[in-house]
Amino acid sequence: MTQVAKKILVTCALPYANGSIHLGHMLEHIQADVWVRYQRMRGHEVNFICADDAHGTPIMLKAQQLGITPEQMIGEMSQEHQTDFAGFNISYDNYHSTHSEENRQLSELIYTRLKENGFIKNRTISQLYDPEKGMFLPDRFVKGTCPKCKAPDQYGDNCEVCGATYSPTELIEPKSVVSGATPVMRDSEHFFFDLPSFSEMLQAWTRSGALQEQVANKMQEWFESGLQQWDISRDAPYFGFEIPNAPGKYFYVWLDAPIGYMGSFKNLCDKRGDSVSFDEYWKKDSTAELYHFIGKDIVYFHSLFWPAMLEGSNFRKPTNLFVHGYVTVNGAKMSKSRGTFIKASTWLNHFDADSLRYYYTAKLSSRIDDIDLNLEDFVQRVNADIVNKVVNLASRNAGFINKRFDGVLASELADPQLYKTFTDAAEVIGEAWESREFGKAIREIMALADLANRYVDEQAPWVVAKQEGRDADLQAICSMGINLFRVLMTYLKPVLPKLTERAEAFLNTELTWDGIQQPLLGHKVNPFKALYNRIDMKQVEALVEASKEEVKAAAAPVTGPLADDPIQETITFDDFAKVDLRVALIENAEFVEGSDKLLRLTLDLGGEKRNVFSGIRSAYPDPQALIGRHTIMVANLAPRKMRFGISEGMVMAAGPGGKDIFLLSPDAGAKPGHQVK
């Protein structure tokens, strides 16, 4: 059946840029990729995009902990994420970042339109504030005793013991997760998105029939409890985009994160030199289809805030949300101590990507059900289905074709009716792929694989091969087996991209959905090479052990300059502005009699001389070598009376001390007296 080609934009939820990709993430990206690959096989124009979610307090604080800039951290994490997704053959057309110029412009545009349309409100709120770190504390950065069940060490938004939700101000004996200090209440003006204004539109969207039943039911609960205005701003310090005309105020990460879908697509259009497609996909009356694959934990943002933001800023809404459940391993939540919290990169060190792609696909449906990765069942299913049923079908027939018939298949089908049974299944299997009933598709394909192997067992080519005058029968039987293998691999192509490549090389033809209507007759195949290897529990044991070792390594004490000399408490800009740093010329440097640590430096500040004692003698045993160098000094430090005289400032140096200390110097061109700004 010929289909009309559609324009489709598909996204996965944006991974947060402060941690590695794990097998929980991979469920969604594999699910989306299988669906996208099927759509492409059917001739549709699909743009498949993603990006890193790169803003927020957790990223700012982790970068500080690592002693690097947030930009450096998210850049390194993006490379790691993209490597992992490529390793699992996720066929993204573009992978970008929310910390991009495209995303900044689109975030400001959407905010400005919402504000102009009256959907942004201002009001002053009271929040918990860390007096030591000088920052307002997000809910998850406050811990204390649950006000309901009195369980200790609970986060500021909900209790993991009794499940209660509450405000962080309701916590008993709250503490800052950042510094351990007791937070204080402080007022701040915040910006709110008027979500209740979109209640009628959102309810109509919910009743349209497009959303999964479980999602629609959950949304109805939210409507009944009443929609609230959404706080879309955060106070400095914060890593993100500053709100236009609001110094010190930043967009909350969940405002610019979904806009990252648009930003990544805009980046793709710009790379292609295509100025038309962005509007074609995102304008209000777009006929293109837009699908978001997401986990059930972020339905609230994608089903309420996101479509309302788009509606209020005159952009199109999603065609649908495809929501999935969580991943458990061996029937339990992923556990670092048990070695079942498995990173994507660790998996690829022990198994190929196709194995996990197949197992997840076999368990997925269109419902929001959790998926259990039972590692013993995983080994059994991969071996039983991929190796024994599919690959074995090719191997048990290819040898005869290669050896006895120079790789040439028979000119007629041995069993046209059986072949028709296989090709007629395209409609049912295609519908299963289309509707995300992946488990059903796999069951249909494996039922066909059983039929194919039963045919070979009944025809017994290994017996026919020994009988005189039956060469034509042998060629026909084995050619039939290879043609059935070709159909099976065509149906499995969205799931097993690497195995498909090897199968296409053997079959000497590309596997296409419509191509199976015409069997390979009189066609020459290539010499058969092993297509897939069996897996065993020893690989699983090695995988689990490797995951445990990674946890131990991550928990090991951090070494290096930051560990030896941690960053001091946060100061305000006003505190820093009090320090007057100046470029100084070292006119003279000499030993200080009676001291084995100090050098006496005579510094020229460009019109004023200073006498400074500095404890750098061990690092500079020849003080004459310092004469003529430029350095940086604290010029407004109060004079300090010492046994050897008065020190009138301090020079800047870095290092742990002793011989390992290094005097700081300005770049070429700086002159004595220049202020460091």
Swiss-Prot record:
Keyword ATP-binding found: yes
Question: What are the GO cellular component annotations?
Answer: cytosol
Which Pfam families does the entry mention?
Anticodon_3, tRNA-synt_1g, tRNA_bind
Q: Which residues bind ATP?
A: K336
Q: Where is this motif: 'KMSKS' region?
A: 333-337
What is the reaction catalyzed? tRNA(Met) + L-methionine + ATP = L-methionyl-tRNA(Met) + AMP + diphosphate
Q: Mind telling me which Gene3D superfamilies this protein's record contains?
A: HUPs, Isoleucyl-tRNA Synthetase, Domain 1, Methionyl-tRNA synthetase, Zn-domain, Nucleic acid-binding proteins
Q: Principal place where this protein is found?
A: cytoplasm
Localization, UniProt: Cytoplasm
tRNA-binding domain residues are: 575-677
Q: Provide this UniProt record's keywords sorted from A to Z.
A: Aminoacyl-tRNA synthetase, ATP-binding, Cytoplasm, Ligase, Metal-binding, Nucleotide-binding, Protein biosynthesis, RNA-binding, tRNA-binding, Zinc
How this chain assembles, per its entry, is: Homodimer.
Briefly state the protein's biological role.
Is required not only for elongation of protein synthesis but also for the initiation of all mRNA translation through initiator tRNA(fMet) aminoacylation.
Q: What is this protein called?
A: Methionine--tRNA ligase
| Source species | Escherichia coli O127:H6 (strain E2348/69 / EPEC)
